[in-house]
Amino acid sequence: MQDVVIIGGGAVGCAVARELSRWQLDVCLVEQGEDVCVGTSKANSAIVHAGFDAPVGSLKARFNVEGSRRMEALSRELDFSYRRNGALVLCFEEAGLPHLEELLHRGQVNGVEGLEIVRGEQLRALEPALSEKAVAALYAPTSAIVCPFGMTIALAENAAHNGVTFRFDTRVERIRRTQAGYTLETNRGTMETRAVISAAGVWGDVLHNQVCGDTARIVPRRGEYCLLDKKDGGLVQRTVFQLPGPMGKGVLVTPTVHGNLLVGPTAVDQPQRDRTATTAEGLAYAQDMARKSVPGLPLRDVITSFAGLRAHLAEGEDDFRIGQPVPGYFEALGIESPGLSSAPAIGAYLAEQAAAYLNARQKSDFDPLRRDIVHLRELPFEERQRLAEENPAYGNLSLIHISEPTRRSYIS
């Protein structure tokens, strides 16, 4: 019998796994995909939000702000890409200024540092490529960008290094409470565990409804993105938002940690939990809205497009559900934006709650570091050549110029 089974190998599930690996517990993470980071965590905006948008007193505000504060140190421990580039929320007419003031006040109450409203020459000095129609912006200097798949993989690798086991291609089809804990029926057999932590994304409500007294309903919300060539990566330095609306934070323009520009997302609710196709209409909308912020955006340089799903709770809920709804069953439900930003804090919280429930003791030999990671794209050509001469796997695979992977990178 396991002590804990974590369901879901996205950013939150892997953050939970890494934090639980601090404890003397037998932990297994199960993921229905072939690897970690194959769902929402691989297809999102890659933003570490500052925390000014989340409603005061909400779980989104609490975990966003704490997660943002944890992220930089976590990136150093686990060696994944992180850059504090700041963010701007644009306002295109004077009538929108009260909304900016509201975001400023909300962020200050939430504990976000350094917020200010900028106008005129100050705004243009920050980002010269912005539309001349932008009259003001909320500036959030603590906003950042990460590599979401690099982050999720790093969390998983460190968890595995500290003893967590992983089972892929394993779909939990049914879960039920037992006297000893929980029985999980999967497509690859039955598992017994003392406790469960569900971080199942758009499938989280299905599991919740099998064991909890109330009913939850998740509506998958699809967002479409365009990725631009690296030659355009310097057009903006900061993440550029427009004023948020009822469907989310709207279409953004942001640099990526790899040097590209990213545009999106759209926001379309759908019944399917696995449909991530892009549409001509969706991509056109994202591009049109992005050009409202940055008119000179060279959309001829789009090199790929993609879509991802976020787990939006229906029935008017606008917050995360994080906790222990029934004894021994912990969950992170409805993790949409700012889920990636919140993942380190959610992971720490749920791990501490589960460890307390199981009366676990901390390990004396927990290793927080991920070492010896080679980032080839950041090395000078001579160093790459030396590595390839020492190990031909470093030079055996060549793909398109988006990210310059090699066979050795994949083996690592």
Language-model segments: residues:
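Helical element adjacent to the flavin cofactor pocket in flavoenzyme catalytic cores
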Residues: 142-194
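C-terminal catalytic lobe of FAD-dependent flavoproteins
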Residues: 257-258, 274-382, 387-396
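Dinucleotide-binding Rossmann-like beta1-alpha1 core, especially the glycine-rich loop
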Residues: 46-126, 135, 250-251, 391
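Glycine-rich FAD pyrophosphate-binding loop
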Residues: 22-41
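Flavin-dependent oxidoreductases
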Residues: 15, 175-180, 184-264, 268-277, ...
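Single conserved hydrophobic/aromatic residue that forms the stacking wall/gate
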Residues: 400-412
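N-terminal Rossmann-like FAD-binding beta1-loop-alpha1 element of flavoenzymes
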Residues: 2-28
